[in-house]
Amino acid sequence: MSKILIIEDEESIAELERDYLEISSYEVTICNDGEKGLKEALDNEYDLYILDLMLPGVDGFEICKAIRNKKNTPIIMVSAKKDDIDKIRGLGLGADDYMTKPFSPSELVARVKAHLARYERLVAVSYTH
């Protein structure tokens, strides 16, 4: 079972994401603030991260940068920030995907599945070489 960390300060959104992901058999942990989320992300192993950008404490850009400096795990940013500059910055810091709010929870699950499948293939290939 793949483990996913959601770092999202809006509890209703985090719970919606969690519910849809758990229905698809993912194990989900939620952190509702940036500092706790960053510590959780760096101290524990997850198969994928879902980050909000506008968080109390440490923002999603900083969390993305910190995760990417240590891990190659897939990162999906989900934010109300719709400007191209925010998307470009997030992707430039190492996010693998960027979704804007409001979003379709089913689409989020589909993107999670796609990123995890690709990441698992890359890991498998790296072990065979």
Where does each model-flagged region fall?
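N-terminal/domain-start alpha-helical segments
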Residues: M1-V123
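Conserved small/polar residues in nucleotide/adenosyl-binding loops
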Residues: T128-H129
